[in-house]
Amino acid sequence: MDSLSTLTASLFIWISSHLHVVNADFKEPNYQPEIKFVSHEELSKIACEKPCPVVGWYPTENQIEGKEVLYMIKGADPINDLCIRTILLHELVHFWQDYNDAFEDAGDSQKVVFTRREQQAHILEHLYRGHQYDEYRKKTGKEYKPRCCKQVAFGRCVNEPGWIDQYIKK
């Protein structure tokens, strides 16, 4: 198992053990999605249909069961960069939701479904990041630097749009 697969497996365990926080009773997927690293330009086109500050994205439509793909920008290092790892976790939560057909109520609008999915992913992402900040502080006696985004939507930093510039080759 390579380092990225090992990280993904550990994030699966973390997600599984924290689902109660968001009142979810998901079955753990018995496989991992393919994680494909693509250029920022390509990911922007896929995720936003125009240039946008996206780092990671799990498309919830047109996935083939057992062959799901999660996208991250080339150069992003979820193994060594906590900020990128939290984005990966957020996108993996969407994979779990997709795997479990979460929020598939025919009476709900796409906006309602999107909001519920994002809310659940945000809560788990923030909890994970907070735990990691605490672990880092206990281990080093220092605050984690640089601080990660406070809010990520569509795999991008909402509160600090310039944050992504360090990951995008211009």
Region spans (language model):
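A metal-dependent hydrolase signature that marks the N-terminal structural subdomain at the beginning
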Residues: 1-59, 156-158, 162-163, 170
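Sec-exported extracytoplasmic/periplasmic mature domains
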Residues: 20, 93-101, 126-133
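Surface-exposed patches in mature extracellular/periplasmic domains of secreted proteins
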Residues: 22-33, 102-114, 133-144
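Secretory pathway export signals and precursors
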Residues: 44, 48, 79, 144-145, ...
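Active-site scaffold of zinc-dependent metalloenzymes
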Residues: 46-82, 92-99
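Post-HEXXH active-site segment of zinc metalloproteases
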Residues: 81-82, 86, 98-127
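Long, well-structured alpha-helical subdomains associated
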Residues: 126-170
